[in-house]
Amino acid sequence: MTERYADKQIKLFSLTSNLPIAEKIAKAAGIPLGKMSSRQFSDGEIMINIEETVRGDDIYIIQSTSFPVNDNLWELLIMIDACKRASANTVNIVLPYFGYSRQDRVAKPREPITAKLVANMLTKAGIDRVVTLDLHAVQVQGFFDIPVDNLFTVPLFAERYSKLGLSGSDVVVVSPKNSGIKRARSLAEYLDSPIAIIDYAQDDSEREQGYIIGDVSGKKAILIDDILNTGKTFAEAAKILERSGATDTYAVASHGLFAGGAAEVLETAPIKEIIVTDSVKTKNRVPENVTYLSASDLIAEAIIRIHERRPLSPLFSYQPKGKNNA
């Protein structure tokens, strides 16, 4: 069992979106979750009560702003306000999944940049720091005027696949869209494997007509993306890989939302295993071939390093021989 962390000035609180990962983070850090309650009135209003003193403490609030996105975001904002009014020393938020991060630019005329709006709201509420996991767009860090620590899951995935023997020239890491090339290359470098990209014509209404840049024939393919939402991107990419001669297809994503009937879509796709982290707690049905890989140890280590003013850089690399990164 993890020993109790000695510094009592640091406190962790979990809101309601993803209690399981919060409990794992607390256990890994050796810090018990603080006592608080959150309830919703019949008209939808949220009431929060912090049931212990936080005066002078460094607070870390754990909350994924996943479905229901707006309820979870407002619960977070209200908790931040409660901590500020209770004279906390610092208020830091831990977002295993950062909702609205996909709305990071104006793609069509008169569209908002909602990721920036959310950043403004959180900053105005009084937070001192953000710890998050695999932002959809890394430039969202620049929407904040406070420190943002964007942790990467690729080292976790690399360790998993290395243990499974999925590495080397017999494996190809595939980005199912051209915007994910950097992510695919990062995993491929860890695995010492080549990369491939699935691209589509400008009109991609028939997405199964995509073509592959790179060689996948006779290789085991690993599809990688940051968010698994409806599952269509992975399902369509897996069919293209199968037609192109890939022997087996695996898929990995940082955040498993499994929305809009994703289980049904993915269960008919030629994918051997799907790996996601536990950044999102979903009530939707999950395919039987899904494996959850916990990001709790990574987040817990980041929290402790931040509190102790130690560098986070060792967390951004994978040491296959278990070297000590301290």
Curated annotation (Swiss-Prot):
Q: Decide whether keyword Phosphoprotein is in the record.
A: no
| Co-factor requirement | Mg(2+)
Binding-site residues, ATP: D43, G44, E45, R102, Q103
UniProt binding sites for Mg(2+): H136
Q: Which GO terms describe its molecular function?
A: ATP binding; kinase activity; magnesium ion binding; ribose phosphate diphosphokinase activity
Keywords, ordered alphabetically? ATP-binding, Cytoplasm, Kinase, Magnesium, Metal-binding, Nucleotide biosynthesis, Nucleotide-binding, Transferase
Describe how the cofactor binds: Binds 1 Mg(2+) ion per subunit.
Enzymatic reactions: D-ribose 5-phosphate + ATP = 5-phospho-alpha-D-ribose 1-diphosphate + AMP + H(+)
User: What is the E.C. number?
Assistant: 2.7.6.1
Q: Please give the coiled-coil regions recorded for this protein.
A: none
Q: Say which domain of life the source belongs to.
A: Bacteria
GO terms, biological process: 5-phosphoribose 1-diphosphate biosynthetic process; purine nucleotide biosynthetic process; ribonucleoside monophosphate biosynthetic process
Q: Which residues bind D-ribose 5-phosphate?
A: D225, N229, T230, G231, K232, T233
Compartments it resides in: Cytoplasm
> What pathway is it annotated to?
Metabolic intermediate biosynthesis; 5-phospho-alpha-D-ribose 1-diphosphate biosynthesis; 5-phospho-alpha-D-ribose 1-diphosphate from D-ribose 5-phosphate (route I): step 1/1
Which EC class, in a word? Answer: transferase
Name the GO cellular-component terms.
cytoplasm; ribose phosphate diphosphokinase complex
* Family of the protein in this entry: Belongs to the ribose-phosphate pyrophosphokinase family. Class I subfamily.
PANTHER family per record? RIBOSE-PHOSPHATE DIPHOSPHOKINASE FAMILY MEMBER, RIBOSE-PHOSPHATE PYROPHOSPHOKINASE 1, CHLOROPLASTIC
Subunit-level organization: Homohexamer.
Q: What does this protein do?
A: Involved in the biosynthesis of the central metabolite phospho-alpha-D-ribosyl-1-pyrophosphate (PRPP) via the transfer of pyrophosphoryl group from ATP to 1-hydroxyl of ribose-5-phosphate (Rib-5-P).
Instruction: Fetch the NCBIfam families from UniProt.
Output: PRK01259.1 (NF002320), PRK02458.1 (NF002686), ribP_PPkin (TIGR01251)
What protein am I looking at?
Putative ribose-phosphate pyrophosphokinase 2
Q: Which organism is it from?
A: Streptococcus pyogenes serotype M6 (strain ATCC BAA-946 / MGAS10394)
